[in-house]
Amino acid sequence: LSISFFTRLREIPAVMDFSVTVQPGEAVGLVGESGCGKSTVALGVMQDLGVNGRVVGGKIKFKGQDLSKVSPEKLRDIRGNEIAMIYQEPMASLNPAMKIGKQLIEVPIIHEGVSEEEAYLRAEEVIRDVKLPDVDRILKSYPHQLSGGQQQRIVIAMALMSKPALLILDEPTTALDVTVEAAVVDLVKDLGKKYGTSMLFISHNLGLILETCDQICVMYSGEAVETGSISDVFDKMQHPYTQALFRSIPLPGADKNTRPLIAIPGNFPLPHERPDGCNFGPRCNYFQDGSCNSQPIPMNKITGFERHFSRCLRINEIDWEAPMSISSQQEKVPPGDVVLKIDNLKKYYEVAANALFGSSGTYKTVKANETLSFEARESETLAIVGESGCGKSTFAKVLMGLETATDGNILLDNKSIGSIPIEARETETVADIQMVFQNPFDTLNPSMTVGRQIVRALEVFKFGKSDDERSDRMLQLLDLVKLPREFATRMPRQLSGGQKQRVGIARAFAGGARIVVADEPVSALDVSVQAAVTDLLMEIQRKEKTTLLFISHDLSIVRYLSDRVMVMYLGHVVELGTTDQVFSPPYHPYTEALLSAVPIADTSVHAKLLQSRQVTS
């Protein structure tokens, strides 16, 4: 299969020479980084490539019929009854002005012509199947009255209403909390078995693919580079990219000092900048000039395996069992003096009552943070962990001065700052506490060059006596975050996600920050980029002796880089200790539930889900 998009100037190949087979009742995982073409394959199967997208080679066959040759009426019938797709953002798939029940019964009424009563009975059945409580209330609710996890379950229920033969899931759990994600994945697995549905599961999370799929197809820059059964690819990988991908994720045992992650060098090629021969060539450790870049490389069958293929010329020359070369080990930096002290911090919000919050005219109190107390030292990484709504981002806002504390104290070098809003804080205090945000795409000014944005931060922090001094410091900051100096003249739109996040980090360190609050700084980035950005943060921390408050719900990364961990639940601290203490028994029950829900990309580790109940508010 080859799919291209056409602009006025050129043809942009999005998918080239791609082949995958999904057997009845089988789950196939499609793995790769942003831009590798995995969602394009899904849209190709749905025949929904838009005006400028076209299948330019190969066929998409469903139950023996070529989907590009069927009539629009037949295609509508197939989409309604036999192929269903679940998208990444559940709210985008639901009509906000229609009750859930009405949205669900539409499917069988339109496509199968059943009566409204029968459709309603089926809707009740699928709501029970997706393990949602209080069926009657759910069917009478609007989408905004449900949580993210409940919305995603409704979208799955909607897809199952037509009892499809093929279910395509495009990153269905990306926006969900780890315990909700684990419950949704378990649900998808069980329903696949119950309904005998085949699944095409698109994700960049190797742990999820391991838990849900039978076969895996690894994609890179528009091509499938390795396909095979889960055990073949995970345990006997035969492509340099698959190997590099596994080395850049924090599996159990990875440690920032003794076993650092190995980031994939270089950048992902844009569709019109692909190299000759092997697309992965410029980033590959085994690249050979003259052979790897001389001709297009076909998929090669691996001897002794029925369905294991790899797109690598040197497949028989590389020693795939060779131990991983350990990159330079780092000395553990001992923590210094206490920089930040939080003492019985409380943050309450008064919410005006309405139909949702009791009778009108009264006020309800939302306790976002309740008696938080802890210390953070120089050169230390303290991870703050918890699900959405646990109060970790509220705490970050109070620390930054964007909100003021209701009660309690925040001491920065023994100076109280908890009740001082950011506009009343001294410049030095503002420079001392900086933040790296979750989404690098939203935090840079699109109309300013990279250099100007960093210089502006230096001006705000009153750094340097002249423009030349500030320009020099800006170039030093680009060096610090390992970006070429010529990036100073580039606009944000010319940068990849990982490069934008590096600019965000450079800006945070512009005023010589003592404390950096990193709010999920790598969750919006690809797996291979995550390793590079995480290691960069660690390296800068060693040089600058910064205190890093790392807010995250990804326990794999927390385990890898933190010195101490604080677990939050509904505004309270439920556990606080060194990383080894928190990640070893005895656990607090909530910590254990969080740990059990983390998908691990290792076939020798068997996960068990302890918690699938809803989080209270």
Model-derived segments and spans:
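Helix-to-loop junction immediately C-terminal to a conserved catalytic motif
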Residues: M46-G50, M400
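Conserved ABC transporter NBD signature motif
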Residues: R54-D66, G408-S419, T429
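Conserved ABC ATPase "signature" region
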Residues: D66, E118-R137, F246, D468-E486, ...
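ABC ATPase NBD coupling module
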Residues: L67-A84, I110, D232-M237, P269-P275, ...
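Charged, flexible cofactor/metal-binding loops and thiol motifs
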Residues: S229-V339, A352-S360, T578-S617
